[in-house]
Amino acid sequence: MVEKAVECFNNQSYPNKELILVTDESNIYLEKLKTFVCDNIKLVEVPKGSVIGKLRNISVDNANGEYIATWDDDDISFKDRLAEQYKFIIESNKEVCYLTNALIKDNIANVVALSRKGLCIDCTMLAFKKTFPRYNDEAKYPNVEDVPVKKHYIKKRQVAWLNKPHLYLYNIHQENSCAYTIQKNWIDIII
């Protein structure tokens, strides 16, 4: 999966980008991850057992840019995702941009769908780093790290909602943290 994530990153039309790969030292793919390191791809190794919120905080701490974006290794960010979101967040004068909907692929049911508008896929976030809150990194909430971040921005009315579902494909598979199949209330149309 990480090969596709790195390929999507390298294919982004936005020129000034950096990818932070965070993994624990027990990762069986550690040697493979090291092969991706270059001028704009950094690898950070952490102790085994860190929850995803902690891993994401580490990636934010290691990022050099003025803006940060979530980059999941199992999803596909199409080539203009960063450029379109960056342009929109600047034009909107907001602190964060989420896509209002996305393409969703259920790899178990072998179905591709267009999510309903307003679903807001959390992993499509692009945010101004200076005002970014910390991810939830408590072990008792290992898979809901994105929710408090999104609620923080919604409460502040600082969200730029971009309706361009063709920029992102959310993959559903048996290792997802939140759902293992498309939920009926998630979709508008099955493609």
Name each model-derived stretch.
Residues 16-26, 42-46:
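Short beta-strand/loop segment that forms part of the nucleotide-sugar
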Residues 82-111:
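Conserved donor NDP-sugar-binding/catalytic core segment of glycosyltransferases
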